């Protein structure tokens, strides 16, 4: 299935649904140079856990995931 990932740019990925969020972060890192540790992947505004698969998160074909930079604060 196709999945859209919006980080600094919009990317189209071909996935099976068995990939983990951590694998998507690694792919975004290779495309845009953003460290996976500095990424937050969002589905409809909710952050996704690294260990979860796309299928477990409810990601369907043609879904757009947002990738935001982690905010540092104290």
Curated annotation (Swiss-Prot):
The organism of origin for this protein: Cricetulus griseus
InterPro entries: FUBI, Ubiquitin-like_dom, Ubiquitin-like_domsf, Ubiquitin_dom
Entries under CDD domains matching the protein: Ubl_FUBI (cd01793)
Domain of life: Eukaryota
Additional remark text: This protein is synthesized with ribosomal S30 as its C-terminal extension.
Family, as annotated: Belongs to the ubiquitin family.
Protein name, per record: Ubiquitin-like protein FUBI
Function: Confers arsenite resistance.
Gene encoding the protein: FAU
């Amino acid at each position: 299935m196709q999945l859209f990932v919006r980080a600094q740019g919009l990317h189209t990925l071909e996935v099976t649904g068995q990939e983990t969020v951590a694998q998507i972060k690694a792919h975004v890192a290779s495309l845009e140079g953003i460290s996976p540790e500095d990424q937050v992947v969002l589905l409809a505004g909710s952050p996704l856990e690294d260990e979860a698969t796309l299928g477990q998160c409810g990601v369907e074909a043609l879904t757009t995931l947002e990738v935001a930079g982690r905010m540092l604060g104290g």
